């Protein structure tokens, strides 16, 4: 009988990784709902780095200013050479200007390098701080937060969003300051040099940018469609991959291939249009620059023939036009990058500002030498205020007893154990361990009294030894091997290439039963005063189940044990069976007593054998 009552957004643990489904990639059109507010939060978060960032921005602006002085000096050099064509070139003056020009460019390059180095250092430190704060936040959030959020979404905030913030701050801020300085500075220098040629360059540039804006607007919808199609095809691949056995069993390969072909064609079409239009941008930028050069040359030639300007002005303007058009595209790219950073920051700060569990530093009560008496007194709980799952639950478990919790799907069995562990806080009544209410003791102390064996096994990428002694210090090899022998795992582990030092990864093929045996051995090694078992033997064969059951019976001696059982045949020897329905205890007693009552438990028990027959 299946028993997994619903909790909002529940994710099943036990997998060492996952595929990226739809929506994992950020599309180019994503924006923050509050751009100014989000950047204000980000700046406030990074305030300790602001003095260094300001120095980096000054370096960026200084390097750009020195670059802007280059054309003016080049104009002077051209003028000196022009005058020397008749009377002889003054090499001292030309050399002096040349060395000054080289000094400007070298200093500009050093300032630009300094800006890049400072920003790279700062952004990596900020990323490290963000990841550290998120990691700490994960441990302070209540379980209810995770029941409302998907694992992929939380992982995306730790990895993708933090990386987006880092890249945007490293590249966009410095580039934006440099681009704005270059744009304003080149415009100022052009007006300072000649107004007519400046207006000519601006008009020529505007014509090209109008064309670029039209194409950008048309291409944006194809980029959005491309991201949507990419998400669909990723989701389809994930579904087919995870359900590959079922697809094979039902001969669904042709149908899956046809669906993939349709999605693949849609992606190809949208990506082709998006990339074609995007591919027009570089030649358009080249066209804008060339158009500016042509306009400046024509206007300069006319003005030179009239004697209004000299040839050196045209030379300077040729460089100023490049400086004028170049930052416009950089500003647009930086603005888009800042939008992406704001969107990522919004998600990160939404997580960091989520309501945490109550601070328990002032709680002084402790659980010492726990015997294992547990009492539930008129407990009330609901995942939402308007959806109460447990209404008025009361029960008493004596130290060393084996308590079985049974009931139909959604009765509240797993929820009850979560409340006992203080994964969730009760809304009424109290739960006591040895007479001490659990809400008067720190959560960590409550957790330290239990070891758990869940239906969904959890193993991490580490050695067999590390998985067995997880968070249990000073475990001897003999104690570890004794636990493995008790669950019938020792022989299998010794057949592995490196025995207990074998790293558990995708190359080590463990059956579900072996994974479960490993987690049971972990619980035996932990040696806590109380146990929680959630259908611990549901995924193993009959022989292994009997072996594990005998080991668990030995482990549960003199320990209070709570067993969530879906197969009632496995709990006949329980000291007390609590029958839950709609969050309330409707029957309690031993197996024989409940069968004799011929009530709800008897119906559940008999229905399993009726289905088996």
Language-model segments: residues:
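An intracellular "coupling" helix at the cytosolic face of ABC transporter transmembrane type-1 domains
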Residues: 43, 143-144, 160-169, 173, ...
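Juxtamembrane loop-to-helix connectors within ABC transporter transmembrane domains
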Residues: 28, 38, 46, 119, ...
């Amino acid at each position: 009988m299946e028993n997994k009552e619903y909790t909002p957004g529940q994710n099943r643990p036990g997998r060492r990784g996952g595929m990226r489904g739809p929506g994992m990639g950020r599309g180019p059109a994503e924006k923050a709902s509050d751009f100014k507010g989000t950047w204000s939060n980000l700046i406030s978060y990074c305030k300790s780095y602001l003095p260094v960032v300001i120095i980096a921005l000054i370096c960026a602006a200084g390097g750009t200013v020195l670059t802007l002085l280059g054309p003016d000096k080049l104009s002077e050099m051209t003028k000196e050479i022009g005058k020397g064509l008749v009377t002889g070139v003054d090499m001292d003056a030309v050399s002096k200007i040349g060395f000054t020009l080289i000094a400007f460019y070298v200093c500009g390059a050093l300032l630009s390098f300094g800006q890049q180095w400072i920003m790279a250092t700062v952004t990596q430190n900020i990323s490290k701080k963000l990841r550290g704060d998120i990691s700490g936040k994960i441990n302070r959030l209540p379980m209810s937060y995770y029941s409302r959020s998907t694992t992929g979404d939380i992982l995306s905030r730790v990895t993708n969003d933090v990386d987006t913030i880092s890249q945007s701050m490293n590249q966009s801020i410095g580039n934006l300051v440099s681009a704005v300085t270059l744009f304003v500075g080149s415009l100022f220098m052009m007006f300072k040099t000649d107004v007519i040629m400046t207006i000519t360059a601006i008009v020529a540039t505007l014509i090209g940018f109008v064309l670029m804006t039209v194409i950008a607007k048309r291409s944006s919808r194809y980029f959005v469609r491309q991201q949507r199609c990419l998400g669909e095809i990723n989701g389809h691949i994930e579904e087919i991959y995870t359900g590959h056995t079922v697809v094979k069993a039902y001969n669904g390969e042709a149908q899956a291939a046809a669906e993939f072909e349709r999605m693949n064609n849609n992606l190809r079409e949208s990506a082709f249009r998006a990339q074609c239009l995007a591919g027009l941008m570089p030649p358009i930028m080249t066209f804008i620059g060339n158009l500016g050069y042509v306009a400046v040359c024509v206007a300069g030639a006319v003005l030179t023939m009239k004697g209004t300007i000299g040839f050196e002005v045209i030379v300077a303007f040729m460089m100023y036009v490049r400086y004028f058009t170049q930052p416009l595209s950089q500003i647009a790219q930086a603005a888009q990058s800042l939008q992406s950073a704001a969107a990522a920051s919004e998600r990160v700060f939404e997580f960091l500002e989520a309501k945490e569990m109550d601070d328990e530093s002032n709680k002084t009560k402790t659980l010492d030498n726990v015997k294992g008496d547990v009492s539930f007194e008129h407990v009330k709980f609901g995942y939402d205020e308007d959806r109460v799952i447990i209404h008025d639950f009361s029960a008493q478990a004596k130290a060393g007893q084996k308590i079985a919790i049974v009931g139909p799907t959604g009765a509240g069995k797993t929820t009850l154990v979560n409340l006992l562990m203080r994964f969730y806080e009760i809304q009424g009544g109290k739960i006591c361990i040895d007479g001490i209410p659990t809400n008067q003791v720190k959560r960590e102390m409550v957790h330290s009294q239990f070891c758990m064996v869940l239906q969904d096994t959890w193993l991490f990428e580490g050695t067999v030894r590390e998985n067995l002694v997880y968070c249990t210090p000073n475990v001897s090899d003999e104690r570890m091997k004794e636990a493995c022998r008790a669950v019938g795992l020792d022989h299998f582990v010794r057949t592995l290439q490196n025995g207990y030092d074998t790293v558990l990864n995708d190359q080590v093929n463990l059956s579900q039963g072996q994974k479960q045996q490993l987690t049971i051995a972990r619980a035996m090694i932990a040696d806590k005063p109380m146990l929680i078992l959630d259908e611990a033997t549901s995924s193993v064969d009959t022989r292994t189940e009997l072996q594990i059951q005998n080991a668990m019976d030995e482990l549960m001696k003199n320990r209070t044990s709570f067993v969530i059982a879906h197969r009632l045949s496995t709990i006949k020897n329980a000291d007390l069976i609590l029958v839950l329905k709609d969050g309330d205890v409707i029957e309690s007693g031993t197996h024989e007593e409940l069968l004799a009552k011929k009530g709800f438990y008897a119906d559940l028990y008999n229905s399993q054998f009726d289905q088996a027959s």
